[in-house]
Amino acid sequence: MPERKAVRKADQKAGQKADQKAVRKVEQKAGQTADRCPVPRPVDSIDAGSLWPEIEKILAPGQGDRAASDAILADIEAGTALARTQSSLLRAPDPVVAALLSTLERQVAEGRASLPDQRHSATDPSWMTRADFCYLSVRACAHDGVSGSFIQAAKLLPAIAADAIHLAPFHPIHFDVVYAPESPSVVDPALADPVLSAAGIGPENQLRAFIRACRLLGKAIGYDLMPHVAQFARVALERPSLFRWIHLDDKRAGLVDADPSRPYGREEREEVAGMVAGICVSAKDNYGISSLKRMEGDDEATTAAKDRAYYTAIRMCIENGIWQVPCHAWNGAGAPAFSGYDHAADYPVFAYRNDRGEDVSAEAYGVSSPYAFYDGLLPNSITEPDSIPIPNDAAIDYFSSIFSGWSALHGFDFVRMDAVDRLLWSSLDTEGTLPVSDGLTPLVVRRALQAARKGHPGIGALATRYGTEVEEFAREGFDLLMGSDMMRRIDAPLLREALALHDRLVERNADPSLHRATVCFAVDAHETSSTRQWGAAMATIMGPVRMGLRHAVARFLSVGGGRRPLYEVMGFQDLSTGLYESSLATRGLQWNDNAAFASAYAATEALYRRLRPFLDTAAIAGRYVCGTYAWWIIVPAGRSGPPHRVVVVALSLETGEGLDPGHIDIPLTSSWGELEGRVHHIPGSTGAEVSVTGSLVLQLKFLECVIVDLEPSQSFY
């Protein structure tokens, strides 16, 4: 179209492109010209220390509720993991948790207890390597016809042994998918308890109450940062310049005014963003509103007007052939390529290919769209010398501000960065600036983490990398990797690799000049039942014995400088299932209420807590792994002469035959003399007495773990 080209040429010459003006106009009208995510303060904000007493007044606990609360409090004050199941705590009346947390709040107010220092206020994020983590989804707390809400989520906290909560996304969503957010700056009102909302404690304050509950119970809290939003998310319509778009012709057969081989340049993005901006302004003007974003405090009429304007804007975009470009597959090259239009379903079809031209559409999720961190990506192809992608600073800055906004307002202690599993292979240059595809690059990650830690150097960072490249990820600013243990059985190859990783971590973390970092031992993760992984819940596939063995290995292989934080998920404690499914549909877990497993979980945690002061300063002195069993010996680190304590861990490994290892003989250093102590079977006994000299003889059953705690006989207690 020569007319359009002439207009563009004139605009370029004047430095005032029409599309940029349109984008600027809509963002000014929405009050969102700054490249930051505008996280709003709660309406009628309540002092954090007053939230649970106020909730207690609203819910009015009765005598029975207070008795139940006192019983839970007694268990907490005993200092051991609760043997009560998460299912039973969840099904307790709401006033019980209100009474419990209000009591803890009064103890703080009266000086009988103190809140632990908030981890993000630390001088560095090394606390992450000493913490343990649990994934918790508010929506998945639904049960027995009760919707998942922040107050339901707070009920689970006393039965979670981990001291850091990885909070799943809590924003409004599309397609019922938790990881397809509509806006990263709003708390989803669907996660708010309606009784509390009606009483004046809205969604933002209910989130604050949950975070306060974590603080009262000594737990850090983490935010889940996503580099994408739902397709046609509200933020995409109001901030279109942050995203990548296509504009189709009237027949939906091809792109308008864009080279199909290079459709994702800055000029193309800004032009279509200007059209989206104009559509958004028109829709908002028609309904008399200034923003599409649903805000706490909006009355019913305003909310309805915003929704009508929002869906009108989506319809107008579709009618004009304008679509957001979806996320590429994790192993894709460049950005997805428009390949046709499904006229029956009325949506564009994209091709997803890797750098070898192979179809990788099976790995793609078409419901979300990435921030346009770079302009100039090629369709299904990596960068060419004459088409170097250019950073889109506005998108990078906006993404980098999301966590900072939430942390500044609510005090989040760490960020879990989603979609970084391929980070080490995401760029073509050593500086991490030239992207292979539309995902995060080291450049973007570094800027986001720098923004997160500005003024708060203690902010931690967890990478969703299912690997052990701790050195490389630490250089980018991460403190933890997820690891891949949740994808494997406890067998000889895993133990050999885990012990080798332990040695790597010990050597690395002994160097004070390096950023301290480690790898989690994940007993489970929220997505392990997906078809890309196990295909069903691990608890269902493995059963209580194998899950208990995973728990024991995670705890007692974590020694000294090779410590690996436990990573668990809500429901693990009583083998409840359905966490992945709850991220794709509005539903809760299948609350299995397995009291026997919860009791075994509590026993393992109690033993670990008793041994932890020793384990944290100890070292693995000897080890052995064969096809059917493994053992390792833990002694004080850096000590010459006979040790004052020895802990031996022995376990039967997963095998195809499923036979008992039977009699095993573990050699001990003869100069240690006679040792005596207790043998703890997991799961099983609380500890039988034993006395040994020179070697330790054990009988191992299939999939059994045995912990032997020994001291020199003259000092045995």
Residue ranges of predicted features:
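Active-site and adjacent substrate-binding regions of carbohydrate-active enzymes
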Residues: 2-5, 31-717
